Each structure stands twice: as structure tokens, then as C-alpha cells.
């Protein structure tokens, strides 16, 4: 009879916490296994199967390996691990001849790592965050405390923006990751936030490749969009109907318009630069204009729910990557708004981990 872990009851609290502590070092393996699975197209291979239930050998026969038989034995262990982490389901059946057949299929969790009907997934975002350039910075996290240094800057002698400008491969990884995750986020945002209704012109400051504006204009085609970002960023931006790509520096000035978007911009900067950016936005707005800030709002107290865990984890990411970068509380956003001249802010909607906050000029 097979041994099932589901039948084991652990009621001793001390044992539970000790076992959780013992498991902590294994957290690294999940990211690395997922990275390998994405690079090998494992999830996509299963998704494209007519049965969507494949054995390790059936999967191995579709990847560029010299020996599918040998590779399937290693792959089986990878697949079992992913099943234990809820990224796959494992199906074990016994044939009439007594042979055991094991197959795997996708779960809602792994569905997020395969391309949706728009070609977007979270896979490029996971690859970016497990890239050696990013991971190596984490080894210097203690220096943020001991020496007050930004780990990424210490590792590479420049900030993350300068690095992506210099390294075309990393710039491509970053753009692809942001393109995919932005597409997913913005589909949700335009569903739950109606603040773009009746708007004639929208400026997306730091808009990258223009994905956010494209999502907005697909629902509100009468909007004229200006996608504003650094010249080396917009040079790779695709052409969209109704969108003009404009190069510039948000720390100096931004184009004028009735509504300005700042999506995941402020968390990259310290308070002083945030106020500069917001003041430039304030000057570019008409009296009845507003800035739509799309950011994560950090809770005042470190709770242990899914939202809180993610928000505090992203705050660590900002600390590693950017000088003064951080996730902010609602009060901290209010303080920035007042310093920049805005009269008030209002939290309008939430999409996944992101909140839509309106900053009013008057």
C-alpha cells in the first residue's frame, strides 16, 4: 500500500513551526524549477496537447534532448515537484497488465504561465526576476543596512535604468516582462475602473512600449494617447492606432494633457524625485485635470494574508533595485500629493495587487 502524506496529522505546534523552518531553504528551488520549465516550454507543451495529459516521456520527446528515455527520468522528478507545488496535477492509473501510467496536466496556477488569447503570460516576468543579473544583487542585500548602498548599484556600478540602457539583452527581457504583465493588469483595470470615460487625451508617463495606453484605447477608442518615455525605450515601441510615442525625461517635464497616467513609476523613485515627477504632472494638467496613479498600496501593519505578503516582498525588490525605491502606504501617497501641489487623492479601484488612485489638481 502506498504511503500518503495526506493521512499524516501533525498537531504539535512546535513540530509544525520547525518543519516550516526546515522548508524555508527549499524556496529557491521553486523559482529555479519554474524557470527551467518555462525555458523548456513544458507548460506550453502540455497546453497544446489534445488530451492535455502527458507523461514525462511524451513531454521529453517534444523537447530538444538527445535521449528522451534518460531525460524523461529526470523530467519525471521535475514534474512531481511541480505537482506538489500545485502547478500541475498528477494522474496515476494502472493498466490491465499491471503497469502504472503517470500523466500530468495544468492547473489554474500554471495557466498563468502559458500564453492567453492575447499572447500574454506571467512567464517573462518570472524569468526576469530569476535572471542572474537580478539574483546576484540579492547577495548584497546586507549592504543596504551596513553601508546604506543600493545592492544593484554596488553589484554593477550603475543603477538599474542605466544598466538596461547599456545591456540590450537585459533591456529586451525587461521590456518583454513588462509588456506581458502590463497587458494582464490593464485588462483587469479597464474592467473595474471607469475613470477614462469621456476623456479625450491621455498621457502615459513612463509608459514603456505603450501597452497600457493600447489597452485603454481598445475600450475607449475616442481617446488620443501619448506614450511618454525615455528615447531608448520608445524606439522599440510598436505602432498603435491613436497613440503617439514621445521621447523625454519625466524628471524634467511631461507633455500636457487632461489626464496623466503614472503606472508603477513612483515606487522606483525616492520621495524627492517622486515630488519632482508629480510637480511636472501638476504643471502639465488643466485646472480640472487629474493624475491616475496605479501602484501597490502597502498596508500600515505587516499582515500575513496574500496581499500583504506580496506587497512587502515587492518592497524588498524595490530596495534591492532602486535608490529610494519603495512601496508606499496611502498616507505616504497623500503626503507626496500635497508636496507636489495636489489638493487631494482618492483610491478608486483595485486590480490584483494594484490600486488605482486619482490625484486631483483642484
Swiss-Prot record:
It catalyses: myricetin + S-adenosyl-L-methionine = laricitrin + S-adenosyl-L-homocysteine + H(+). One of its GO terms (biological process) is biosynthetic process. InterPro entries: COMT-like (IPR016461), O_MeTrfase_dom (IPR001077), Plant_O-MeTrfase_dimerisation (IPR012967), SAM-dependent_MTases_sf (IPR029063), WH-like_DNA-bd_sf (IPR036388), WH_DNA-bd_sf (IPR036390). SUPFAM superfamilies: S-adenosyl-L-methionine-dependent methyltransferases, Winged helix' DNA-binding domain. Mainly expressed in stem and petiole trichomes. Pfam families: Dimerisation (PF08100), Methyltransf_2 (PF00891). PROSITE patterns: SAM_OMT_II (PS51683). CDD domains: AdoMet_MTases. Flavonoid 3'-O-methyltransferase involved in the biosynthesis of polymethoxylated flavonoids natural products such as myricetin derivatives, aroma compounds possessing antioxidant properties and exhibiting pharmacological activities such as anti-carcinogen, anti-viral, anti-thrombotic, anti-diabetic, anti-atherosclerotic, and anti-inflammatory effects. Catalyzes S-adenosylmethionine-dependent regioselective 3'-O-methylation of flavonoids; active on various hydroxylated flavonoid substrates, including myricetin, thus producing 3'-methyl myricetin (laricitrin). This is Myricetin 3'-O-methyltransferase 4. It comes from Solanum lycopersicum (Tomato). The lineage of its organism: Eukaryota, Viridiplantae, Streptophyta, Embryophyta, Tracheophyta.
Amino acid at each position: 500500500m502506498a504511503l500518503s502524506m495526506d493521512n499524516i496529522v501533525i498537531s504539535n505546534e512546535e513540530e509544525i513551526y520547525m518543519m516550516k523552518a526546515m522548508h524555508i531553504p527549499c524556496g529557491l528551488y521553486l523559482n529555479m524549477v519554474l524557470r527551467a520549465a518555462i525555458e523548456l516550454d513544458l507548460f506550453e507543451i502540455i497546453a497544446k496537447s489534445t488530451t492535455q495529459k502527458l507523461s514525462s516521456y511524451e513531454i521529453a520527446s517534444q523537447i530538444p534532448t538527445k535521449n528522451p528515455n534518460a531525460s524523461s527520468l529526470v523530467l519525471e522528478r521535475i514534474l512531481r515537484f511541480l505537482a506538489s507545488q500545485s502547478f500541475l496535477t498528477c494522474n496515476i492509473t494502472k493498466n490491465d497488465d499491471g503497469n502504472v501510467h503517470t500523466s500530468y496536466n495544468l492547473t489554474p496556477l500554471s495557466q498563468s504561465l502559458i500564453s492567453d488569447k492575447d499572447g500574454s503570460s506571467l512567464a517573462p516576468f518570472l524569468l526576469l526576476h530569476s535572471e542572474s543579473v537580478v539574483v546576484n544583487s540579492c547577495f548584497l542585500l546586507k549592504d543596504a543596512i551596513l553601508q546604506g548602498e543600493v545592492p544593484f548599484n554596488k553589484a554593477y556600478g550603475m543603477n538599474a535604468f542605466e544598466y538596461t540602457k547599456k545591456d540590450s539583452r537585459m533591456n529586451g527581457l525587461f521590456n518583454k516582462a513588462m509588456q506581458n504583465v502590463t497587458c494582464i493588469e490593464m485588462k483587469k483595470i479597464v474592467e473595474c475602473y471607469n475613470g477614462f470615460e469621456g476623456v479625450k487625451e491621455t498621457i502615459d508617463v513612463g509608459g514603456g512600449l505603450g501597452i497600457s495606453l493600447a489597452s485603454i484605447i481598445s475600450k475607449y477608442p475616442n481617446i488620443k494617447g501619448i506614450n511618454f518615455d525615455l528615447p531608448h525605450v520608445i524606439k522599440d515601441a510598436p505602432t498603435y492606432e491613436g497613440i503617439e510615442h514621445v521621447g523625454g525625461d519625466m524628471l524634467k517635464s511631461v507633455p500636457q494633457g487632461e489626464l496623466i497616467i503614472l503606472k508603477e513609476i513612483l515606487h522606483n523613485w525616492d520621495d524627492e524625485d517622486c515630488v519632482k515627477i508629480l510637480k511636472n504632472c501638476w504643471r502639465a494638467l488643466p485646472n480640472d485635470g487629474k493624475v491616475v496613479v496605479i501602484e501597490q498600496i502597502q498596508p500600515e501593519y505587516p499582515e500575513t494574508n496574500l496581499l500583504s505578503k506580496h506587497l512587502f516582498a515587492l518592497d524588498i525588490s524595490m530596495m534591492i533595485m532602486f535608490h529610494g525605491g519603495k512601496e508606499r502606504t496611502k498616507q505616504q501617497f497623500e503626503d507626496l500629493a500635497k508636496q507636489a501641489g495636489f489638493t487631494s487623492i482618492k483610491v478608486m479601484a483595485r486590480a490584483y495587487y494594484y490600486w488605482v488612485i486619482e490625484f486631483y489638481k483642484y
